[in-house]
Amino acid sequence: MIIERWEVKLSKCNQNVGGYSVLSGNLKENIKLGRRAQKYLKELRNLQLKPLKIGGYENCGTINGEEYFLEVIHITSGRQKIDVAVGKTWNVTNIENDNKEELQYELFKEKLKVGKQDMLFFSWMKSLSVQLNAPLHQKMTEHGLADDNTRLEWFNIPLLRRSQYRKKVPYPSLRQMSSVLEVQCSTLTEEKLNFCVGFSDKPLSEWKPQIFEQTYNRYRLQRISPEKSFKYKSRCSKYNFKTSSQSWVVKVPEHDQQLNTFEKRYDELFDAQFNKLEFFKIRMKKLKKNKPIEKKNYKIWCLEKEDLKDLVWDPLKRICNHSRYAIFEHVTINREAYSIKPLRLTFQKLDSGSLDLIDNQKKTFGSIKLAMSMPDVKKTENQSIEESERHDETAIETQEFDENDCLSSKADINTSLAPQKRSFIDNELMSMLVTKKKIKKDKDVSDTGISSTSYLINSGTYANSHIEIPTSNSVYNGKEDCSFNNYSVKHSILEEDIENKCIAVNENKVIENQKVIQSLCKNSHLDLIEQSYFGECDFIINHSTCVYKIQASRFMQLRNNGSLHYDKAVNDLLTEFQRVIIIVEFSEIIQDVDPDLFWKIKLYLLNSRVDVFFIHETTDFFIDWMKYFIARWAFSYNDEKEKNIANADILLDLGFNILLVRKIFQTYSLEEFFMAIIKEESKAVKMLTVSQMTRLKKLLTLEW
């Protein structure tokens, strides 16, 4: 790679100008003067002096005006903003030439430092008018100057013109509106009492003189002469009496007046005809601000635009005026070549026999070493032969029993025969065991009668009437009575129906359902996943079905906001699942005390997406129902398709359950699923609820 560099030779600085060779205008900078210097500058205002020589004063010598360059500034206040314009510059004339030819040279203005000699010069100029016969500020004619040996001409000291003051625009004076409230508050209420005497009905013993003593000083009483009526005017009477109704004024004290005004304001507040604008007409006292601290504001010299243009330093201005050929003659361009060395990327060595894992919750890392073992072919063949023979024997034996005993016999035989084990029971012994179990079961039913659960379920209070026939490989016959007695459910589900099925359990309720989880995973290869789900469900059967266990005793309880105890939890589950299975646990006491509670619960939960089941408060019944739900609605997921799951955390953060995420990634990748939602394909839309669709569409409409 080649880079071209442009080298510019620096021009030599002019020492006479102090290095400012490019500047062609005047340089003006700030000068700080004391009070005396400012006083002398005021007196030298409008003066023009030339190099002069005064006879009789040898000590003074000659004074050359070229050594001094003065400018007078009008003193202004710090808060006043003015624009100062520079007048004509002063011209120094030659003494020898009478033609008054002006000296032509460049004038450069720099800082002026006033020292002791300058102060002596200013004091001498002050006393100069006394030594001369004429004052300096008077204009002298050429004839007077010719007669005198000393020719006095004036230095032209430029003045900074002061611009006009900026007038402050006064604020608009608005008239204050007359306020009724203000007038009432400013005036005191006065009352007049006629000359009359009143007596109280109370006895003298109840009269308290303390009240009169406390209020005596607040009133000013005047003596009133009694009214007299004369029928005739006596001649000897010295006074003439005029009859008139007399009264005295009683002023209400201040505190009473305030109470009176507040009572009036209270009446006006609740008066519909009172205008609200009266409250805005009341005058408010202005707050007195503290005086600001006076700061020393330094005076700034303001220059005109023409003078500022001369001060602009543009070194390339002259170069642009020249041609390219003239520029490249004096300018050299150097070429430099360099190369970039690429960095070597180093990667960590990965072992082929290990798998690195990251725990998102605990924020820990770990690795697993993988190894593969070859199975023994002979053992697998023998096991498959034994299992096939065992299934054939059980199938032949079960065909000999009656159809009524088919359900119980097959369940008992299959549960007793554990996998990978032999049975040493003969056919005769097996038939004897079956008959004994049948007799024992009939006795138990005849003694106890119909159970409470079966009575409620048979009477129609157990759930919504729509019940599907299971399509699994269980021994349950769909043509039989669908009363769903607890005992019939217990014997209708086999362990084989739960094999390789996958469900999810809510991590927040693992401790509560610990016994149920242990019994489900004890004798079956059930794939159970824990998920910290935000809902109140206990188990998730598939991507659209969940199980929620509630207590019948708490159903009618009310919360602080007036809703039922389980109202919010059921509504939240309906927004996330297409089917919600609610298992209501009840006790025998509730059945006897409040039998109407069951149809109330059923009536409240009457919904096409809700299935309700009533069971006793025992874990065994709940386990049997869970086996039935797993065998009926749970699915088995393929591990090979699950390897394609990537970025599953995106859907989990949206509130999707883990089984729904698995269902989505079985048919789509993440990008394909988003495209299917945008196109609103029916297959993808059926998986989600309305709430899940809205959340997903909000995610797809985000912009970065």
From Swiss-Prot:
Coiled coil ranges: none
Nucleotide-binding is among the record's keywords: yes
Cellular compartments annotated: Nucleus; Chromosome
One example GO MF annotation: DNA secondary structure binding
GO biological process, one term: homologous recombination
Main location: nucleus
Keywords annotated in UniProt: Cell cycle, Chromosomal rearrangement, Chromosome, Chromosome partition, DNA-binding, Meiosis, Nucleotide-binding, Nucleus
One CC-aspect GO term: synaptonemal complex
Expression induction: During meiosis.
Subunit text: Interacts with ZIP3.
Family: Belongs to the ZIP2 family.
Function as written in the Swiss-Prot or TrEMBL entry: Required for initiation of meiotic chromosome synapsis. Involved in synaptonemal complex formation, a structure that tethers a pair of homologous chromosomes along their lengths and plays a central role in recombination and homolog segregation during meiosis. Required for the normal localization of MSH4 to chromosomes.
Full protein name: Protein ZIP2
Source species of the chain: Saccharomyces cerevisiae (strain ATCC 204508 / S288c) (Baker's yeast)
Gene: ZIP2
